[in-house]
Amino acid sequence: MTAILERRESTSLWGRFCNWITSTENRLYIGWFGVLMIPTLLTATSVFIIAFIAAPPVDIDGIREPVSGSLLYGNNIISGAIIPTSAAIGLHFYPIWEAASVDEWLYNGGPYELIVLHFLLGVACYMGREWELSFRLGMRPWIAVAYSAPVAAATAVFLIYPIGQGSFSDGMPLGISGTFNFMIVFQAEHNILMHPFHMLGVAGVFGGSLFSAMHGSLVTSSLIRETTENESANEGYKFGQEEETYNIVAAHGYFGRLIFQYASFNNSRSLHFFLAAWPVVGIWFTALGISTMAFNLNGFNFNQSVVDSQGRVINTWADIINRANLGMEVMHERNAHNFPLDLAALEVPSING
């Protein structure tokens, strides 16, 4: 009898826990994805803060030349970064217990791998949590679909690219100047500016910003006046009211006359679908481009493609970009190799005598 009562109590406790986890009445929804999201993001954030402040230099290139990234080792907010895991580690899973000591783990850049893997798991769970809350509330799942774009972008630069290049040392450093360095080296090695998927991403981000600004300014400018001319239009509204606060017909008419009739949406759902889909699809393409360039399927190469009747090269902008790429490539990882692959000889010259 006692055992039965204990089992009922245990089941009841588990049931209450399940109800609390999945309750939409909590101030912040937790959800089953949140059970994994909370510890992973807390771990990534905590280690990032500690390492950004106090991590010792990391031997990123695996040539016994450590690079300093933390504040206590001479950096500031702009130059500081979490230095990627050493090329000596490559793609090996490198938790603390795989190193001979914590000092060795820090020297080889263990914190970078720890932060990145926990972060990617955390943001993936955040996306799942968005779907889960939408499901509980009877909503459609497109919020999580939209969030998949930045998740895909982060996964591309932190996981897919290192896998393709064979080492976590090629991942994006976690810092401001480190991000810019990653972009410059990526251009030098993969010619990303000449990749059509990157072009689609630029159109998505800049176009999304333009459309967002246009939509926000149109809505704000076409409020339905609920007040007299002598008082502010803002006085006619309450936050969260059910009634619409702007006139889409007026906005459609304004924009249709500003450009042309069919450049303007007269359906609110179509408009907002477009506002969501444009940047999301663009960022999807950029993430796909990074993931293909990770395996060295690079941007277009139009170098020396225009010649005169004598066979002399007439330089185009492609040749200017190529010269810049070579300059950037010979400058990075300056002590890891004498020449970049582009400038290395195909065959070792024979030596007589």
Curated annotation (Swiss-Prot):
Keyword Flavoprotein: no
Site residues, Stabilizes free radical intermediate: 190
PROSITE patterns hit by this protein: REACTION_CENTER
UniProt keyword list: Acetylation, Calcium, Chlorophyll, Chloroplast, Chromophore, Electron transport, Herbicide resistance, Iron, Magnesium, Manganese, Membrane, Metal-binding, Oxidoreductase, Phosphoprotein, Photosynthesis, Photosystem II, Plastid, Thylakoid, Transmembrane, Transmembrane helix, Transport
Example of a GO MF term: iron ion binding
Residues annotated as site: Tyrosine radical intermediate: 161
Entry comment on modification after translation: Tyr-161 forms a radical intermediate that is referred to as redox-active TyrZ, YZ or Y-Z.
Transmembrane segments: 29-46, 118-133, 142-156, 197-218, 274-288
Catalysed reactions listed for this entry: 2 a plastoquinone + 4 hnu + 2 H2O = 2 a plastoquinol + O2
One Pfam family, short name: Photo_RC
Purpose: Photosystem II (PSII) is a light-driven water:plastoquinone oxidoreductase that uses light energy to abstract electrons from H(2)O, generating O(2) and a proton gradient subsequently used for ATP formation. It consists of a core antenna complex that captures photons, and an electron transfer chain that converts photonic excitation into a charge separation. The D1/D2 (PsbA/PsbD) reaction center heterodimer binds P680, the primary electron donor of PSII as well as several subsequent electron acceptors.
Protein name: Photosystem II protein D1
Taxonomic source organism: Agrostis stolonifera
